[in-house]
């Protein structure tokens, strides 16, 4: 969310690194996550993250790919909100994620006494992606993740209205 890219490591990757061995990562594809709209006041970063994970995990659409968050919706969210979404992106099975930077990002670096670390990052005019995920932030509602993975994400109101239906879905998994 601050113009950087990191890759999470699991136990096997960490063990290889401790033994001085490398692990291969294929050149990843890049999926554009086009954010439009603005989250409602009662919607938090976890709701947005669960909506994304619910859309892409089970079909492996973003598996081992880089998510690039772009679009006018990015600027509608604070840095803390973006960070909240970003911490959950690994649950989508993506390799990593990167966000377009903006004035809020610049202010974040200034507040943290690192103004020289800010770099403008945005997609080029003719940017091409291996796929696109469109997220209209205006339509996101409070979500809940049921066992056994965050991709079992449903609107909270739906689960409250018919808990038996959603518990049955979870049991089938």
Describe each model-derived feature in a short phrase.
Residues 1-173:
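Fe-S-dependent hydro-lyases/dehydratases of central metabolism
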């Amino acid at each position: 969310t601050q113009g950087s890219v990191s890759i999470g490591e699991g136990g096997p990757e960490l063990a290889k690194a401790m033994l001085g061995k490398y692990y291969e990562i294929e050149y990843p594809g890049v999926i554009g996550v086009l954010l439009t709209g603005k989250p409602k006041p009662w919607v938090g970063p976890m709701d947005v993250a669960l909506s994304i994970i619910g859309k892409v995990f089970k079909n492996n659409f973003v598996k081992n790919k880089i998510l690039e968050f772009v679009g006018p919706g990015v600027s509608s969210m604070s840095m803390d909100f973006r960070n909240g979404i970003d911490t959950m992106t690994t649950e989508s099975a993506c390799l990593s994620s990167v966000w377009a930077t903006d004035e809020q990002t610049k202010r974040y670096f200034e507040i943290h006494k690192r103004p020289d670390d800010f770099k403008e990052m945005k997609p080029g005019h003719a940017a091409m992606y291996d796929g696109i995920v469109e997220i209209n932030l205006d339509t996101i509602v409070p979500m809940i993740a049921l066992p056994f993975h965050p991709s079992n994400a449903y609107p909270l109101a739906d689960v409250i209205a018919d808990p038996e239906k959603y518990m049955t879905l979870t049991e089938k998994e």
